[in-house]
Design a protein with these regions (language model features):
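Conserved short alpha-helical segments that host acidic/polar catalytic motifs at enzyme active sites
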Residues: 3-188
């Protein structure tokens, strides 16, 4: 609780000096095996805030269940309340600041994305550009995939879910071998 309260205090102070005119690209952050993972992820996203202004999200995992919170606006406006951070339970978290380069500026396109697969749940946050996302998406749709977002990140999630591999890590590797472009990923 001390760390969470300290984090909220820092965010409120930093928000006063934030310049919303700076806009670049998305930012991703991940942390594992630590108490107050949601608060530390919010703080990490805040440090990346200059890179994305449209929205932000955090997915956490408590060893059994995933929790997700995604909102339009700045990190300091959305993750500065103890109640919000307490709802994001778990010692593992990933987060994303959104500045759309592909996909529409809608709530459903705010990452991280979470999906249940036949190997279990997975959370994905992506930064960068997939140069073959349109062709991959078209192929997945031809094969029966249903997309909920217009973000190229969902293509990664769909590739993981579609993989014939058994273990989650093998599904991820299978998906990564199909992706082209420059990007970073954090997964949970």
């Amino acid at each position: 609780n001390f760390l969470m309260k300290k984090h909220i205090k820092i965010l409120k102070k930093k928000l006063k000096s934030f310049n919303p005119r700076l806009k670049e690209e998305c930012g991703i952050f991940g942390i594992s095996n630590t108490k107050d993972a949601s608060a530390l992820t919010a703080l990490g996203l805040h440090a990346l805030q200059h890179r994305g202004q449209e929205g932000c999200g955090i997915v956490t995992f408590n060893g059994k269940q995933y929790f997700s919170e995604k909102r339009f606006g700045l990190v300091g406006d959305n993750f500065n309340k103890e109640k919000v951070l307490k709802n994001l339970q778990g010692d593992h978290a990933i987060g994303h600041n959104r500045y759309s380069t592909t996909g529409e500026n809608t709530l459903r396109n705010i990452q991280p994305f979470f999906a249940d697969t036949n190997a279990g749940g997975i959370g994905v946050a992506h930064n960068g550009n997939l140069t073959n996302s349109i062709s991959l998406r078209n192929k997945l749709v031809e094969d029966g995939a249903i997309f909920y977002t217009t973000s190229d990140t969902e293509t990664i999630v769909q590739l993981i879910a579609k993989s014939k591999r058994v273990k989650t890590i093998d599904k991820v590797v299978d998906a990564i071998f199909q992706i082209q472009g420059g990007y970073s990923l954090v997964m949970l």
